[in-house]
């Protein structure tokens, strides 16, 4: 259990811009779980909520990038067919 707490703290210390999609998603799930569980003071809850918002935004950026790569690949495939 202590290792899990250390892992959570290390993840929270990692800049969001350096996290991959899966790491962002997993941390976001954990943030939501902690917020839903309750028992945190207001400041801790706000800090978690802000981190969650940043994580959600980064997840959306990763998905938008993946979507663009797929669209580009499909467009290139269609151009090759012509």
UniProtKB/Swiss-Prot annotation:
- Positions of transmembrane segments: none
Q: Which HAMAP family match?
A: Exonuc_7_S (MF_00337)
Family label: Belongs to the XseB family.
Q: Which GO terms describe its biological process?
A: DNA catabolic process
Q: Which InterPro entries does this entry report, sorted A to Z?
A: Exonuc_VII_S, Exonuc_VII_ssu_sf
Q: Which gene encodes it?
A: xseB
Q: What is this protein called?
A: Exodeoxyribonuclease 7 small subunit
- Which keywords does UniProt give here? Cytoplasm, Exonuclease, Hydrolase, Nuclease
Q: Which GO terms describe its cellular component?
A: cytosol; exodeoxyribonuclease VII complex
According to its UniProt record, which reaction does this protein catalyse? Exonucleolytic cleavage in either 5'- to 3'- or 3'- to 5'-direction to yield nucleoside 5'-phosphates
Localization, UniProt: Cytoplasm
Subunit organization = Heterooligomer composed of large and small subunits.
- Name its species: Mycolicibacterium paratuberculosis (strain ATCC BAA-968 / K-10) (Mycobacterium paratuberculosis)
């Amino acid at each position: 259990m202590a290792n899990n707490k250390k892992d959570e703290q290390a993840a929270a210390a990692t800049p969001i811009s350096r996290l991959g999609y899966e790491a962002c998603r997993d941390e976001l799930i954990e943030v939501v779980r902690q917020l839903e569980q309750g028992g945190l003071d207001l400041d801790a809850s706000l800090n978690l909520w802000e981190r969650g918002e940043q994580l959600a935004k980064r997840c959306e950026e990763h998905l938008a990038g993946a979507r663009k790569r797929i669209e580009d690949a499909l467009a290139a495939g269609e151009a090759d067919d012509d």
